[in-house]
């Protein structure tokens, strides 16, 4: 391997097969219906500034790993937010407010979901309250404030910020627009996921009837992964091998699939993959993920900065790709899997295979990126 031949070993922490795997399209579409998926695409595709984000061929990496094609869905180009999250929170704001300008929307976020809600609120002329944990960088908080949101920092982690959001929203009669589901709060996260599924519609249009064999999906609370799998059930004729990747410090989907029930992770160390550092899978995506994810992979933070650098200097493709830390895990897990011959064989990765990765965001925190790629 030319690019990867410097003796560096690409690492994964754990690889898990889903013993309960059964990809049932009809069952998946009971969680998010065809109509909900179609409504999201029909609405979002009419928004000002909408355009499908690029599907970039990582031709150099494909050759290195002896795969037919590796594609990278580049969400750096998504509206002004430069993240797939623009599809979810903003669409949910539109759905729940129904043109009522007096509604105040609120959410808790690790960054990009809050930016989407703030952007969606500004787009509709609404007031917006954003709750962030103390671990969210100053740059990410400022990005939401720049969109007109009132940003409230909460001591503790993401879960603490969510609890404070729920408390203050209940006290003040604000409308919570969250991407996390819990008992009696399912509809808004479904709207958010329906928005995310637009990516899968675009991919289907972009691959020109090529058969995708594998798709690697990042998971925090599982919303994007569940949405993309719902999109597969809606739009694809074949069923690709579905792989979820998470930080090893917050592998809540992996642990839940291991036991067959929702498991809460006590996060001892915050991952560099901040938007994925979540301790509990959301209920709506869990109903999809528990049977339709074939394999789970957890990763350490070791290769995040290097992967961002290699994407950015055209090592993996003919294009320079501006990637954030949450865009790197899919590529890392694919390289690490190909370097482990047992895993490569189990995943059936060979010269005929075509793999989708989701480049979920650009470098929304440039100071953090500079530090990462210099290490």
PLM segments and residue spans:
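PLP-dependent amino-acid enzyme catalytic core
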Residues: 1-375
């Amino acid at each position: 391997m030319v690019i990867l031949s410097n003796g560096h070993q690409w690492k994964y922490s754990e690889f898990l097969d889903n013993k309960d795997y059964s990809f049932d399209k009809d069952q998946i579409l009971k969680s998010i219906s065809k109509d909900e998926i179609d409504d999201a695409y029909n609405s979002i595709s009419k928004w000002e500034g909408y355009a499908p984000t690029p599907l970039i061929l990582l031709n150099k990496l494909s050759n290195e790993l002896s795969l037919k094609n590796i594609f990278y869905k580049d969400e750096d180009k998504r509206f002004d937010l430069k993240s797939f999250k623009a599809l979810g929170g903003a669409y949910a704001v539109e759905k729940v407010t129904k043109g009522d300008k007096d509604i105040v929307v609120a959410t808790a976020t690790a960054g990009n979901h809050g930016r989407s809600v703030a952007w969606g609120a500004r787009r509709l002329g609404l007031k917006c309250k954003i709750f962030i944990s103390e671990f969210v960088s100053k740059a990410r908080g400022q990005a939401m404030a720049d969109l007109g949101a009132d940003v409230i920092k909460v001591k503790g982690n993401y879960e603490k910020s969510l609890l404070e959001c729920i408390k203050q929203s209940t006290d003040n009669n604000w409308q919570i627009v969250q991407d996390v589901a819990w008992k009696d709060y399912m509809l808004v996260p479904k709207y958010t996921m329906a928005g995310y599924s637009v990516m899968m519609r675009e991919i289907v249009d972009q691959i020109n009837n090529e058969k995708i064999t594998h798709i690697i999906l990042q998971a925090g609370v599982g919303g994007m992964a569940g949405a993309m799998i719902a999109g597969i059930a809606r739009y694809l004729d074949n069923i690709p091998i579905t792989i979820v990747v998470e930080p090893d410090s917050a592998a809540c989907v992996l642990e839940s699939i291991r036991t067959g029930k929702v498991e809460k992770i006590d996060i001892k160390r915050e991952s560099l993959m901040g938007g994925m550092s979540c301790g509990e899978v959301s209920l709506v995506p869990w109903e999809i993920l528990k049977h339709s994810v074939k394999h789970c992979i957890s990763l350490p933070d070791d290769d995040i900065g290097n992967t961002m650098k290699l994407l950015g200097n055209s090592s993996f493709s003919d294009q320079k790709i501006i990637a954030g830390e949450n865009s790197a895990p899919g590529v890392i897990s694919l390289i690490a899997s190909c370097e482990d011959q047992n895993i490569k064989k189990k995943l059936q990765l060979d010269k005929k295979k075509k793999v989708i990765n989701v480049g979920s965001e650009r470098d929304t925190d440039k100071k953090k990126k500079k530090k990462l790629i210099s290490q």
